[in-house]
Structure formats: C-alpha cells, structure tokens
UniProtKB/Swiss-Prot annotation:
One of its GO terms (biological process) is mRNA catabolic process. It comes from Streptococcus sanguinis (strain SK36). The keyword RNA-binding applies. This is Ribonuclease Y. Endoribonuclease that initiates mRNA decay. Its EC number is 3.1.-.-. One of its GO terms (cellular component) is plasma membrane. HAMAP family: RNase_Y.
Length: 537
C-alpha cells in the first residue's frame, strides 16, 4: 500500500484544517473588528447627535432671549412714545392757556393805559380850564385897571387943556420943545450907547484879529524845564569809581557843584538832581568829562568844575548873541547880550525865560507892525522886558526894578526903559509899545502848557532854603539837596570854629521852621573844611 498518498491526504487534511482554522479565526477576528468599529461609529454618531442637540438648544435659548429683549425694547419705546405724546399734549395745553393769559393781561394793560390817558386828558383839560379862567380873571382886572388909567388920563388931559388955554404962544412953544427934547434925549442916549458898543465890538474884533495873526506867525515851541539830568555810563562798574573810597569822590562832586548825585539800581545811569539849571549843567558837563577821561578823584573833579564854569560863561554869551540876532537886535550892548544869555538857565513857572523873551519880542514886533508902530523898537523892548530876572538872585530888588536900572545904565531908549518898568503895572505905561509888550507878555505866559505853578513853587522853596542859610555870617556856600530835604552849608573855616558849627545848625533849623512851610523833615548839615595847599618846586 502506497503510504504516500495517504500521507499526502492526511497532510492535505491537516493543511485544510489549518487553513480552515485560520480562515475561521480570521473571519471571527474580522467580525469582532467590524463590531467594534460599528460600536465606535455608533458612539461617535451619538456624540455628534448630542452636540448638535445641545447647539440647537442653545440657539433656541438665544433666539428666545433675543425675542424677549426685543419685546422689552419695543414695550419701552412704546411707553416713551406715549409719555412724549402726553407731555407734548400737556405742553400744548399749558402753552395755549399761557397765551390766553398773556392776551388777557395785554388787554388789561391796554385798558389800564387807555384809562390813564383818559385821566391825563381830563386833568389837562381841567388845568387848561383853570388857566383860561385865571387868564380871563387877569384880563378882567387888567381891563378894569386900564379903564381907571384912561379915566385918570382924561382928567389930566382936561386939566392940561384948561392950563394950555390960559398960556401964550411962546409959553406953549417952550413946553412943546421941552417935551420933545425929553422924548428925544432918551433916543439920543440909546443911539450913543449903541454907537459906543459898536465901536467897542469892532475894536475888540480888530484887536483879536491882530493877536491871532501874531500868534499864528510865532512858532515858539519849548518844553518846561526839569530838575533832573541823566548821564549814561559805559557800564555799572563806573558807579563805584564815581562814589570813590569812603564816598570822597561823590562828596567832593556834590560840594563843588551843589548838585545831588543819585546812584540807584537803574542800570548804566547816574541822575543829577538840582533846581539851579546852571549848576546842573556844570555838573552834567563835569560828570561826562570824568567818564570820558577815566581819572576820577577829588583834584580832577575840582579842576573840571572850574573849567566847565568858564565854558558855561562862554556858552551864556553865545546864547545871548544868538537870541539878539534872532529877534533882529544885533546892535545890543555886549554886556546886555551876556546878561540875556543867563536867562537860558532861568525858568519862570517852568517856562524858559530866554525863550519867553524871544517869543514876547516877536509877538510885540508883529502887533506893533499891525498898529503902525515902530516894530524894531517893540521887539527890542519885548526882548529886554524880563532882563532883571537874570541877576535878581545877586542884586536886591524886584526883577522890574533891576531891569529898569540895567536899561538906564546901558542907555537904552526911554520907551524901552518905560516898557520894562511898566510891564507888570508898577508904573504907568507912557507909550503904545509899552502896552503892546505887556499884552505880548501876557499872551506868552498864558499860553496853555507854557508854565507850571507847582514846579515854580518847588524851586522857590529851594531858593528860600539857600537864602536862609546864606543869611548867616561866615557861610560860604549853601546847597539845597535831596529835593529840598537837606540843606548843606559850607562855612568859612577862619570865621566859624568847630564849636560854633552845632550852634549854626541849630539857628538855621530854627529859622527854617519859623519862615518856611515844607513837607516832612529838612536835614541841616554844616561842613567846615580846612585845606592847606602848597607846591613843591
């Protein structure tokens, strides 16, 4: 028996069993995996369905909330709209009622005004009736009085006729002439008075025209003098040099010039204060020369002060000559020119006296020419009318008396002498030119802005201070400083000893208190300086 086929059959059966087992196992495994996959898919689908259901539920909730919110808003808007309509209805009703009230009030006001007007009309009519009644009563009384006057006149005429009937022709003519003369005398007096008034008005008009023409032809512009001068410094370091060691430079400067030096916080400026324009000009020139030279010490200050005093004298002469040529009087005596030049540094109520004199001279010449008088002589008289003011501080007497004596001394024309003497009414004017100059003087002084009373009073007080100090024996110089709050007195050392200085200060203080009126306090300073000078050769 061939075993090979059996073995092959068995082997084939075994292989078939194995293959069958493997197939069955594979099928079983495949079925399990399919079942698991199906389960997973089912779970996934369930999860998806649950998520979808939840989302749909959320959407339904949100939609419900939106619908609820929309319903609330609509309800709120409807409520607001209802409230607005109700408010508008109430406002309209209130406005209508208020308009009706205004109309009622307006009608009442108009009715009240109408009643007031009617009341006023009735009052006016009542007053008019009362006035008419009073007027009729007055007229009735006037008529009664006139009737009485007429009756009285009739009686007088009857008596007059009875008297005339017994007169002769000559007597009747004399009576008629007397009555006519009495009637005409009043008319004649009226005509004479009218003629005099007409002449006066015409003369005033002519005089005004002459004065207006004269004033329009004069251009006399000048500024009221001040009491301060400023000097500009190159830099603020110069202030210390001006003061000097222990203040010796500034003390020397003030003592020699009589001018107060004010050094304050104002940058690069030094102020020179003093009421005397000549002293102030000398001080200004000296200060500028010191700043330019650079050497600032007491000896140099003294040297420059003396030099500038001489320079001022020359300038005074030049001022006088220029003024004389300006008004057409070149033949004026040289000494009178110099004296007139001093008026450049003199003020009267703040008005520069030299410019005032030139203005008066020009006005006088123009007015004299209009009136047919000697214009040259009028200009000369007007120019010299205040010449006494140039030296009235050195010579006793008023400026009128001093000016009159100067004019006589230098043999001026008698008309000029009388003009100077009479321009303030001290003596009677003897010529038309004297009257013209007085009028021109008043015109120049009265021009608005020409003079300042307060400045003149201030300067007069300072002058009085110095005059009181100078009235004591042994006083060399005195200077009013600090706007009149200090009087500094320089004494002669050979006449006033040290033990007398205190007594002198006390006496000056007492005299100031008894003779002057001033605000605040016045410091009295007396300085006695002994100086010995020698030269080494």
């Amino acid at each position: 028996m061939d075993l090979f086929p059996i073995i092959m059959s068995v082997f084939a059966a075994i292989i078939g069993l194995v293959i069958g087992y493997v197939s069955v196992s594979a099928k079983m495994k495949s079925s399990k995996e399919a079942a698991e996959l199906t389960l997973l898919n089912a779970e996934q689908e369930a999860t998806n369905l649950r998520g979808q259901a939840e989302r749909e539920a959320d959407l339904i909730v949100k939609e419900a909330k939106r619908e609820t919110s929309s319903l609330k808003k609509e309800a709120l808007l409807e409520a607001k709209e209802e409230a607005r309509k109700y408010r508008e209805q109430v406002d309209a009703e209130f406005k209508s009622e208020r308009q009706e009230l205004k109309q009622i009030e307006s009608r009442l006001t108009e009715r009240a005004s109408t009643l007031d007007r009617k009341d006023d009309n009735l009052s006016n009519k009542e007053k008019a009736l009362e006035q008419k009644e009073q007027s009729l009563s007055d007229k009735s009384k006037h008529i009664d009085a006139r009737e009485e006057q007429v009756a009285e006149l009739e009686k007088q005429k009857a008596a007059e006729l009875e008297r005339v009937a017994s007169l002769s022709q000559t007597e009747a003519r004399d009576i008629i002439l007397t009555q006519t003369e009495d009637k005409l005398s009043k008319e004649i007096a009226t005509r004479i008075r009218d003629a005099e008034q007409d002449i006066k008005e015409r003369s005033d008009k002519v005089a005004k025209n002459i004065l207006v023409q004269a004033m329009q032809r004069i251009a006399g512009d000048y500024v009221a003098e001040q009491t301060n001068s400023t000097v500009h410094l190159p830099d603020d370091s110069m202030k210390g040099r001006i003061i000097g060691r222990e203040g010796r430079n500034i003390r020397t400067f003030e003592s020699l010039t009589g001018i107060d030096v004010i050094i304050d916080d104002t940058p690069e400026v030094v102020t020179l204060s003093g009421f005397d324009p000549i002293r102030r000009e000398i001080a200004r020139m000296t200060m500028e020369a010191l700043l330019k030279d650079g050497r600032i010490h007491p000896a140099r200050i003294e040297e420059l002060v003396e030099k500038n005093r001489l320079e001022i004298d020359n300038r005074i002469r030049e001022y006088g000559e220029a003024a004389a040529y300006e008004i057409g009087a070149p033949n004026l005596h040289p000494d009178l020119m110099k004296i007139m030049g001093r008026l450049q540094f003199r003020t009267s109520y703040g008005q520069n006296v030299l410019r005032h004199s030139i203005e008066v001279a020009k006005l006088s010449g123009i007015i004299a020419a209009e009136l047919g008088e000697n214009a040259n002589l009028a200009r000369r008289a007007g120019f010299l009318h205040d010449i006494g003011k140039s030296i009235d501080r050195e010579v006793e007497g008023s400026h009128v008396e001093i000016g009159t004596e100067l004019a006589r001394k230098y043999k001026e024309h008698p008309v000029v002498v009388n003009t100077i003497a009479s321009h303030h009414g001290d003596v009677e004017a003897e010529s038309v030119i004297a009257v013209i100059v007085a009028a021109a003087d008043a015109l120049s002084a009265a021009r608005p802005g020409a003079r300042s009373e307060s400045l003149e009073s201030y300067i007069k007080r300072l002058q009085d201070l110095e005059e009181i100090a100078n009235s004591f024996k042994g006083v060399k110089n005195s200077f009013a400083l600090q706007a009149g709050r200090e009087i500094r007195i320089m004494v002669q050392p050979d006449k006033i000893k040290d033990d007398k200085i205190t007594i002198l200060a006390h006496d000056v203080r007492e005299k100031i208190e008894n003779n002057l009126e001033y605000p605040g306090n016045i410091k009295v300073t007396v300085i006695r300086e002994m100086r010995a000078v020698d030269y080494a050769k």
